[in-house]
Amino acid sequence: MIEIPSDLHKDLVPLVFLLGDWAGAGVHDFPGAEKCNFGQEVSFTHDGRDFLEYQSHTWVLDNDGNKVRPLESEHGFWRIDANRKVEVTMTRDDGVIEIWYGELADQKPQIDLVTDAVARTAASQPYTGGKRLYGYVKSDLMWVGEKQTPEVELRPYMSAHLKKVVTPEDVERWAKALPDDMPDDGIAFFK
């Protein structure tokens, strides 16, 4: 269920499908790096201003799905203009700072992004740019990331399937919104 918070900046309504906490798993595979399954937690929040704040933490999973060690972390800010153009500024824990531009698709919750600028610290690994695709499919958030380095052409390196995290506060809020005249069997149909 997608809810539009009353204090959400009006410009962000097209991105409302991103809001909330997400968790799931994916695959990481890039030449010269460890191939692994990973877990991920993502958060998109807002404070009433004209951007979403984004945080992502990933970790390597063992064969039983247990956390082994951190993989990557990102923090950024997402904006959208009246023409559905999306702008993202992002800082990664590996010493890379990126500016991404893209577009929200017409008639579907899908965002295509491509890097416009990349800045790297001396300690970071070689990286020259990337692409990302985010999509909201059947109430889940899915994404795929591509990257390139001076030695490797643009190719997919990470993808994940995330589920919305439901908190006890969400359940309580939804329960309070139920009608008082619920049938005894607990089944109700809403118009």
Curated annotation (Swiss-Prot):
UniProt motif (GXWXGXG) ranges:
20-26
Disulfide bridge map? none
- Pfam families, A to Z: THAP4_heme-bd
Q: Which domain of life is it from?
A: Bacteria
Database matches in InterPro entries: Calycin, Nb(III)_bact/plant, Nitrobindin, THAP4-like_heme-bd
- Family stated for the protein in its record: Belongs to the nitrobindin family.
Q: What is this protein called?
A: Ferric nitrobindin-like protein
Originating organism: Streptomyces coelicolor (strain ATCC BAA-471 / A3(2) / M145)
